[in-house]
Amino acid sequence: MSNVLELTIPASTANLGVGFDSIGMALDKFLHLSVKETSGTKWEYIFHDDASKQLPTDETNFIYHVAQQVASKYSVDLPILCIEMRSDIPLARGLGSSASALVGAIYIANYFGDIQLSKHEVLQLATEIEGHPDNVAPTIYGGLIAGFYNDVSKETSVAHIDIPDVDVIVTIPTYELKTEASRRALPQKLTHSEAVKSSAISNTMICALAQHNYELAGKLMQQDGFHEPYRQHLIAEFDEVKTIASQHNAYATVISGAGPTILIFSRKENSGELVRSLNSQVVSCHSELVDINISGVKERIVYQ
C-alpha cells in the first residue's frame, strides 16, 4: 500500500480592518486532509462533514484543479489519489476556506509529484494563484503576517508580526457571502487623498500592534477606507455585533476577510461574557472564541 499524506491546515482571517489584501492571521480552525494513491481510474473524495459534501468530485474540484496546475508547472504527473477531507472551516464565510484548500493542494502536488518545494516556494505559488498573500501566508506559516505580492515580478514579500495578546472572537452568520460578490461592492477607484489616508492608518496600526498597543491598534482597525465602508451593509448583523462588543470594551470589531464573519479583538477579562452575550442576542449567528494558530500547515507522512 502507498504512504498516506496527512495535512492539518489552519483557517485564517484577512485584512484586520485596514490591512486590505495584505494582512492576515491564522486561526485554530482546520481543514484535515488524508491523501493516498488509489487503484481507481479517477480521483476519489471521501467527505466527513456536511459542508464538504457539497463540493464537486470531478475535475472541477478546487483541490484537484490546483494540484494539477502545480504538477503541470513542474512537468510532473500525479498518480490517481483518494482524498479524505474533514473541515472545521465554514465555506464562504471569510475564514480562508479557499486558501486552506489551495495550500493543501500545493502540498499534495509537492509530495506525490516529488517536486521538493521549499516553504518559500509554496508561498510564492500560493500567492500567484490567489492574487494576494493575506490568507495564504498565515495559513502556511501560522501567526500574524503582513505581505505584498508584486504582480509584475510575481514575487511575494512577507513580514511576521508578534502575536497579539488579545482574545479573538468570530461571529459567524448562517449565510454565505462569496468573495466575488463582496468584491463587487468595492469602488473601482479611490482618490489620491483617500488612498494616502487609508495607507497612513494601516501603517500606524501595524506599528501599534508591534508595540502591543492594542487600544490604538483597535481604534485604527475600525477606520478602514479601502473596503469596510462598502461591505458592511452586506452583513445584516454587523452593527449589532459591534455595539455589543463596544459595550464589553472590545478593542476592535471588523469584517473577517470578505465576510460575512465578524472578527472581534477582545480584552481577555471580558471575552467569555462577550461571547455569551453575542450568542444570546445575535441568534442568527454563532459566536465563539478561537485561538490564534502559530504553527501553520502541518504535514505528516504515515508509512504503510
UniProtKB/Swiss-Prot annotation:
Gene3D superfamilies: 3.30.230.10, GHMP kinase, C-terminal domain. It is an enzyme of class 2 (transferase). Keywords: Amino-acid biosynthesis, ATP-binding, Cytoplasm, Kinase, Nucleotide-binding, Threonine biosynthesis, Transferase. It catalyses: L-homoserine + ATP = O-phospho-L-homoserine + ADP + H(+). GO terms for cellular component: cytoplasm. Its EC number is 2.7.1.39. It comes from the Bacteria. One of its GO terms (biological process) is threonine biosynthetic process. Pathway: Amino-acid biosynthesis; L-threonine biosynthesis; L-threonine from L-aspartate: step 4/5. InterPro entries: GHMP_kinase_C_dom, GHMP_kinase_C_sf, GHMP_kinase_N_dom, GHMP_knse_ATP-bd_CS, Homoserine_kinase, Ribosomal_Su5_D2-typ_SF, Ribsml_uS5_D2-typ_fold_subgr. Coiled coil: none annotated. The keyword Plastid does not apply. The keyword Transcription does not apply. GO terms for molecular function: ATP binding; homoserine kinase activity. It is found in: Cytoplasm. ATP binds at residues 90-100. Catalyzes the ATP-dependent phosphorylation of L-homoserine to L-homoserine phosphate. Belongs to the GHMP kinase family. Homoserine kinase subfamily. This is Homoserine kinase. The lineage of its organism: Bacteria, Bacillati, Bacillota, Bacilli, Bacillales. The gene is thrB.
